[in-house]
Amino acid sequence: MKNISRSFWLSGALFALVASASAQIVEFRATINAAQEVPTNPSAATGSAIMIYDVASNTFDLVVSISNFPATLASSHIHEGASGVNGPVVTNFGGEAVYTRNGSTLTATFRGVTHGGTKLTLLKNGAYVNFHSSAFPGGEVRGQLIAQPKRLVANFTVAQEQAAFPAATLTGNTNAFGAAVMTYDSGTNVVNLRISLYNFPNTLTNSHFHEGAPGVSGAVVQNLGAGTVVNYARDGNSITGTFLNLTYGGDPVKLLTGGAYLNFHSNVFAGGECRGQVIASEELPGTRVANVSTRGFVGTGSQVLIGGFNITGSEPVRMLITAKGPSLSTYGVTGVLANPTLTIFDGSGRQMAQNDDVGTPAAGTELATIYGVPTSTLESALIVVLPPGNYTAIVAGSGGTFGIALLEATDLRNNATILSNRAAGATGAEGDVLAEFKRDLRAAATNLRWAAAKPTGRPEPELCVGVPLGVQAPAALAQAQAR
């Protein structure tokens, strides 16, 4: 029970720390035991520590819990040293007096502590917490501080490029835009990066990470390559890029504190057609809308299935958007759309991306591993990084096909609330339109309104809350009417 209690205590303390933290933070975790001491000792004490480190201010909050530690705590510190190596003290916490004791368990929370060591050493997992007692003055238990991957984001615009090159004639001559999401592990210096570029008809001649503040042209620190490298894929005027396990060539501190940007060069704009400052995500743990979907009839011509959603805040979101038809027959749906196509538009009506037939995803690709990708080769799917804004996804029938289709949008992030609003409809189609979702949402039936005057002969809309396809319904379902 002691370990369970410590886990709950650490979780609660972590939430309190994160809730007040700035964006430029890196989380560190440490498993504390005697086996990491040099030399090791027979102490049975074990524990955990969580640090929230603000890279910009060089300050941190730390929560610690150690059990089976009956001896008086003589002192505690952060030392600089790699795993298996003893190093000098850089930050002092104090002894027993600054901890709370409950039997043989010690706990403490330290806030706003200035780190006495070097930023880069800490970020590269080169520091550890050490707890000393009279029995083991060199340290009874210690734990290496391991950096957790940090989420970074970037929104690409022409305006950011224009600010760095005032004499250039970018604005009005290109409408390129896009976004990127990435994780950076400072301990291993590895970046996992995903890019989406839209309205980019020109040839992508090169792309890089640069170091520089907003509005400043800086040096290249990491080359990503031209649009011809295998990491990029073009479909019309949209380009997607995936770079996994990339060793970062720049300064980790600058990357984590807004001092780097992504730049995309073209044959028309050699200095860069659009760019985006890389910033640390401000995302906090919270409820996530995992999936929203709309099921309805798709006819010919203008009889399409429409889904709308809105991404709020300042950060882009990586999403899987799919159009399914043939696979619905597995769940007993009849008259399915045999060959659905999928197109995404932004709030200005600009076409961003399109897919007709996902085919058979190649082994090892993301489409082959992500849950929710269509199982029929004739269905459609797009994995995109979308900047904040309003979006519309449209499902149509290829080759004059018609029938029932399912439009789904899935958030591929962890711990995020992003879909603040969504709308669905089917133009020119009679019958029901089904909107589906996963996770906690509320439907206020009294707030449902016709966008314009209700068409003559149309029945009043009715809202029913049910269960997904293939799931047995509970004994009772909530049902409400909107009048």
For each feature predicted by the language model, list its residue ranges.
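Sec-dependent, cleavable N-terminal signal peptides
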Residues: 1-25, 483
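Metal-centered catalytic cores of metalloenzymes
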Residues: 23-76, 80-207, 211-284
